[in-house]
Amino acid sequence: MVKLSIVLTPQFLSHDQGQLTKELQQHVKSVTCPCEYLRKVINTLADHHHRGTDFGGSPWLHVIIAFPTSYKVVITLWIVYLWVSLLKTIFWSRNGHDGSTDVQQRAWRSNRRRQEGLRSICMHTKKRVSSFRGNKIGLKDVITLRRHVETKVRAKIRKRKVTTKINHHDKINGKRKTARKQKMFQRAQELRRRAEDYHKCKIPPSARKALCNWVRMAAAEHRHSSGLPYWPYLTAETLKNRMGHQPPPPTQQHSITDNSLSLKTPPECVLTPLPPSADDNLKTPPECVLTPLPPSADDNLKTPPECLLTPLPPSADDNLKTPPECLLTPLPPSADDNLKTPPECLLTPLPPSAPPSAPPSADDNLKTRAECLLHPLPPSADDNLKTPSERQLTPLPPSAPPSADDNIKTPAERLRGPLPPSADDNLKTPSERQLTPLPPSAPPSADDNIKTPAERLRGPLPPSADDNLKTPSERQLTPLPPSAPPSADDNIKTPAERLRGPLPPSADDNLKTPSERQLTPLPPSAPPSADDNIKTPAERLRGPLPPSADDNLKTPSERQLTPLPPSAPPSADDNIKTPAFHPQRMIISRHLPSVSSLPFHPQLHSQQMIISRYLLSVCGFRFHHQPMIISRHLPSVSSLPFHPQLHPQQMIISRHLPSVCGGRFHPQRMIISRHLPSVSSLPFHPQLHPQQMIISRHLPSVCGGRFHPQRMIISRHLPSVSSLPFHPQLHPQQMIISRHLPSVCGERLRGPLPPSADDNLKTPSERQLTPLPPSAPPSADDNIKTPAERLRRPLPPSADDNLKTPSERQLTPLPPSAPPSADDNIKTPAERLRGPLPPSADDNLKTPSERQLTPLPPSAPPSADDNIKTPAERLRGPLPPSADDNLKTPSERQLTPLPPSAPPSADDNIKTPAERLRGPLPPSADDNLKTPSERQLTPLPPSAPPSADDNIKTPAERLRGPLPPSADDNLKTPSERQLTPLPPSAPPSADDNIKTPAERLRGPLPPSADDNLKTPPLATQEAEAEKPRKPKRQRAAEMEPPPEPKRRRVGDVEPSRKPKRRRAADVEPSSPKPKRRRVGDVEPSRKPKRRRAADVEPSSPEPKRRRVGDVEPSRKPKRRRAADVEPSSPEPKRRRLS
């Protein structure tokens, strides 16, 4: 075996790679061996050899090539000193490599291993090098690397020594570092940070890119392994390599974390990127920023509510109706679930409990409430949104004292017995069945405890194919004649027959057929006996009248609002019946804090709901078992899901209902408080006819009032009432927004007039508010019957009834009556208020408004009896709107000032303001949004010195006597009348302490869609005190346009005025008089001079005034000429000045 020893000296190794390869080939040229083996040796030496290495006196490297046999070569590589490795490591001596995996070495290695075949830039020399095998970085790069790393290596070695020493010392002694050792440790940390900063500054961006690519890919691998989406910032280069090689994902400690970088770069911030989600808009809770939640395709709105602070994403259909209760309680998503389903399920009210005297049972304590309150109904695919709510809120008749068996069965049957739906059932069919009130049952027996109520509740009427939605309302309120005194057998049967005997529907029946049957009132029964305690109300409530084929949609409203004459003083037997609320009645009180969560049935007829602000003395009432009371200050009343198809005639939203204790509320009435901030979200039906809506500000003394069930009154000061989604096709004439409806307690306004063939669509409204003549002194029997007869006797509708005719007739004012007598106490005001005048064909649009606000002469001094009746009559006679009324007509009427009133008396302290407040004007069909606001703020004239009787009547006479309009009246005529200023009022008295501020405070004009921003302030300013100033304002208006250009021109010419004056001063000694003469001759040129003089007030203000008075007619053209001449002269003047 032949051995060949080749000595590689430092001089030999100092050559570059090409020379080294040539010399090695020359040395082994004579050796007969396969060239491939020799080339392997040469390439190996060339690959791992670095030029200019300092061996520090270490032995040379010996390469021995041995030839054991012919054609065979054995190559042995001897490495004498271990810290010098030319194959894998760099060097150990002064520039030796310490084997640490720092950032730049890892970056270089990642580029060398993973980017084969790709061009890159050296991290140290910034040279473009190739990463193919056999062509590595040269020795020059290694030397540069040594110089950069030297400081860091030393600091790191010292840190290790100090840390080891300190740790060893602490381990032995069991205590922390001393002050000296702590100082040493801090010094080492400082050196380490300096080395890191120095090292990082030396890494070029190209070298950092490789590191960033590796870090990002490691993060992507980690995220991919956890099932989360890829990191989106991977570069194309690393992605290509990753897709080609797919190496195992490195751990975060090796690939990312380093001891040298642990303080500067926390791994949590660098390597835990948040996964971006396309659908994640606002749902990611701020607390969970670093903890991504797995996205769910179907989980849109329900996932984030678990976190309290997670905002809900906006929904296209979610306008203002999202209930606040549902924000923090996630509900399971349902495909067909509308926004109203959750509040129904969440806030299901509990049925009334048994009398507190009855001993509660263990089963009753849990079952009833759990079913009603917290047990949501499962949604079905075909189930409309209203079906579960129908079952939930089905009212049950009051049960007898519960027995052991009745404790569980009876409520379950009443509550949970759903009615089978029919194919042709309209949306109103279930509501008819749901809320059909049952008459109170006789003292229940063991068998009657279950059967009787089930029969009454669950006997649905067969629907007809052609039933329209409005037909039922006709049948609902049809009054029945009073029944005979009930017998013992009649105690159960009679009400069931009357309630559940369905009338056969006719083919032409309108949609109101079911509602007619539901709310058909019964006449009052005879004085109640022990058995009659239950029957009589059922008779009154549930005797439906058969509908007629030609009944128009408005027929029920005619019947509904027919007023009843006041009843006789209540007797001992009447003590129970009169205040007893109708079972289908809902009372929402202002001061009941916890009632806000009561979910109203979505298909409830708005007639059946009363939301009142003040129900002070309700404690003496015997509320029906299913009344609902909602507080005024409950912010979540907005989430009350009123039925979207509610007819607005059936809703009354009132601000004040103070003394309700004596009032006999109709069961189908809705009153909503003024100060409910979220009332705007009440989803009124989009097809509501605005004629059926009355928005009133004040209903103070309701104690004696008998409200009609189908009335809507919405408060003026509900800030969000503008958002009420009234139907886009609402006829504005059908909306009555009244500002003042004060004393409802004494109103006897409901005597209907017979309709004529030519009556417009407003015929029902005529009939509604037609006052009835006063009844004879009531007898004991009349205490119950008379009001029912007056209320429930509908007038037959005519075929040609139009909608608008009645409004003309309704509000026709009557001349003031003579001093009232005892008999005149009731009749006279009704005659004045309710005798409509027939409209004329040529009446212009302003006809009603002219009549409305024409003041009446003051009435005679009122008598003691007139103290109550007169205001109700005056308040409740709304003026009808005309079809062609423009938007500005009402505003003209509104602001017509009245003469100041006399000093108020003690009685005037309360009543007078209500009278002034409650004269609403009716809107017209073409009225824009401003119509109601104009009418609302119509000021009332002050009353004469009030006497005890005049306390109520006199202002009503002044308000309600309209003058007949003329055919040629323009739209602006009323505005002239409106802004007529009033003389100052007398000094206020102690009683005026309340009235005066209400008048001043309560006259805000509501903004309309077409209203410009400046229109209301102009109207208010004109209305205040500027009618005498009108000619002055007109002149000022004429003068206003010229001063504005003057000011602008003055600003432009200010710098040039001084040189003009200087020039004038220069020319003045020569010929000032001819200048004045020329100015008089050339008037158009003088004006610019005078304007400039006007601008320079301190110089000569008096001559300016005199000249202005002389040249007033010609100033406008002069100003124009001056404007034309100004730009020419001031510019050269400015140049000369500058």
Curated annotation (Swiss-Prot):
Q: Key word rRNA-binding present in the record?
A: no
Could you state one GO cellular component term attached to this entry? membrane
TM region positions: 73-93
Q: Which residues does UniProt call coiled coil?
A: none
Q: Which domain of life is it from?
A: Eukaryota
For membrane topology, the record states: Single-pass membrane protein
- InterPro entries membership: NPB13-like_MII_rpt, NPIP, NPIP_N
Q: Where is the composition biased (Pro residues)?
A: 349-359
Question: Where found in the cell?
Answer: Membrane
Any one Pfam family here would be: NPB13-l_MII_rpt
Query: Where in this protein does the record put region Disordered?
Result: 242-578, 747-1138
Compositionally biased, Polar residues: which spans?
Answer: 252-263
Compositionally biased, Basic and acidic residues: which spans?
406-416, 448-458, 490-500, 532-542, 782-792, 824-834, 866-876, 908-918, 950-960, 992-1002
Keyword annotations for this protein, in alphabetical order, are: Membrane, Transmembrane, Transmembrane helix
Name the PANTHER family for this protein: NUCLEAR PORE COMPLEX INTERACTING PROTEIN, NUCLEAR PORE COMPLEX-INTERACTING PROTEIN FAMILY MEMBER A2-RELATED
What the record says about family reads: Belongs to the NPIP family.
Name of the protein: Nuclear pore complex-interacting protein family member B13
Organism field: Homo sapiens (Human)
| Organism lineage string | Eukaryota, Metazoa, Chordata, Craniata, Vertebrata
The gene coding this protein? NPIPB13
